[in-house]
Amino acid sequence: MAYVKERIYESMFIIAPNVPEEERENLVERVKKIIEERVKGKIEKVERMGMRKFAYEIKKFSEGDYTVIYFRCDGQNLQELENFYRVTPEIIRWQTFRRFDLEKKERKAQREKAAAEAVETGEGGSEA
């Protein structure tokens, strides 16, 4: 099997405001479980942003409960997450996208760390 590099993704979803708080918490837990089990991802961070006003109405609502989840996966099973969002009526909007900027920062930090280690061990230096 070929090695597939893990990528960093951000998934934002909005839960309808008429859903009770306990049920909203359960929905967030279900999304996390889908990311871990079906998408085979590793969750990095979960941000519950709470109720926010919309710039325009969405499905006759003027506000919603926002949640953002950052996770790593190879991207092959992301459709499982999108399908869950699509068939869950309490989730009124969602968007999942790859975070190239975070991947770039991570690669840069790894290169800098490797360069610092090379200097410490005396590798890759110029000869006098």
UniProtKB/Swiss-Prot annotation:
- For this entry, list what GO says about its biological process: translation
The answer to whether UniProt assigns keyword Ribosomal protein to this entry is yes
State the CDD domains in the record.
Answer: bS6
Keywords of this protein's UniProt record, alphabetized?
Ribonucleoprotein, Ribosomal protein, RNA-binding, rRNA-binding
Record has Methyltransferase as a keyword: no
For this protein, the record's InterPro entries field holds: Ribosomal_bS6, Ribosomal_bS6_sf, Ribosomal_S6_plastid/chlpt, Transl_elong_EF1B/ribsomal_bS6
GO molecular function terms attached to this record: small ribosomal subunit rRNA binding; structural constituent of ribosome
What is this protein's function per UniProt? Binds together with bS18 to 16S ribosomal RNA.
Similarity comment: family membership? Belongs to the bacterial ribosomal protein bS6 family.
A GO cellular component term found in this entry reads: cytoplasm
Descriptive protein name: Small ribosomal subunit protein bS6
